A protein has these predicted regions:
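Active-site-proximal loop/helix segments of hydrolase catalytic cores
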Residues: 153, 207-245
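Binuclear metal-ion centers of metallo-dependent hydrolases, dominated by the metallo-beta-lactamase
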Residues: 179-195
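Active-site environment of divalent metal-dependent phosphoester hydrolases
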Residues: 146-150, 172-174, 190-193, 207-209, ...
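Active-site metal-binding motif and surrounding structural segment of the metallo-beta-lactamase
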Residues: 118-166, 182
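Active-site metal-binding loops of divalent metal-dependent hydrolases
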Residues: 108-110, 145, 204-205, 236-238
């Protein structure tokens, strides 16, 4: 009995020391939390379809013409700037970024609906290009796992699975299951070099969830992209907090 208690004591001490050595956003239950000083998420969101539909009817859902990208113009510009650095908006949080010889895609979503089911929230504007029309991608950045940023259909059908994939902690499995070979998970403030680019995952004030049981079990973050004298911050759905002061 004494031996059992001693072993149990050692396990508790070891786990305590291990947690003390982990960053503050790592919680003992294996989940993550926002940086210190971030606003707290209070209460539970009360969802009502009747309220949602009632409030939706009050909104002007007309899409401004300037918000709809002309596909031919986008393709023309991609060809025109293929040997130059550029940032091209595809839709929502999806951008094509070219720096030197490296082409980056961010949070690509090419599906009609964002959600676990085919009838989830539907986008109002199609992406400027289809998956088949995007240029060769060398680097795939994913900020977090919400359905309007992490699109399973896009990940599964993505034509350039030899691209480097960089994701926050515990998101790599969503890529390796579809035979991506170069998948790297980063914690906040970790950096990785890809060709001539330096990619750093920075904190964000957000959260993660894809089901009823996985709240905050995967990390989220912003990406700092550095290339020569250029710096680009690609931010996920982040709130404001002490980290931005």
């Amino acid at each position: 009995m004494k031996k059992f208690l001693f072993i149990l004591f050692l396990i508790i001490i070891t786990n305590t020391i291990a947690m003390e050595n982990k960053p503050s956003h790592h919680q003992s239950n294996g989940t993550f939390k926002n940086p210190a000083g971030s606003p707290e998420r209070t209460g539970k969101v009360k969802w009502s379809w009747s309220t949602f539909n009632k409030e939706k009817k009050k909104l002007d859902m007309t899409v401004p013409k300037s918000h709809v990208l002309n596909k031919n113009e986008v393709l023309k510009n991609l060809e025109l700037y293929k040997d130059k650095d550029y940032i091209g908006w595809i839709g929502h949080a999806t951008f094509l970024i070219k720096l030197g010889n490296t082409t980056i895609i961010t949070d690509p979503v090419f599906s009609k609906n964002a959600g676990p089911l085919i009838f989830g929230p539907k986008r109002y504007v199609d992406p400027a290009l289809s998956l088949k029309e995007i240029p060769k991608v060398d680097l795939f950045l994913l900020t977090h796992n919400h359905y309007d940023h992490q699109d399973t259909a896009t990940i599964r059908k993505f034509p350039y699975k030899d691209a480097n994939v960089i994701v926050p902690l515990k998101l790599g499995k969503y890529f390796t299951k579809y035979n991506y070979k170069k998948v790297n998970e980063l914690d906040w403030f970790q950096t990785i070099q890809v060709n001539d680019l330096k990619i750093t995952l920075l904190p964000a004030v957000h959260w993660s969830k894809r089901s009823l049981t996985d709240t905050n079990k995967t990390l989220w973050g912003n990406f700092l992209i550095e290339y020569k004298n250029k710096k680009i911050l690609f931010a996920c759905d982040t709130g404001y907090g002490q980290i931005y002061k």
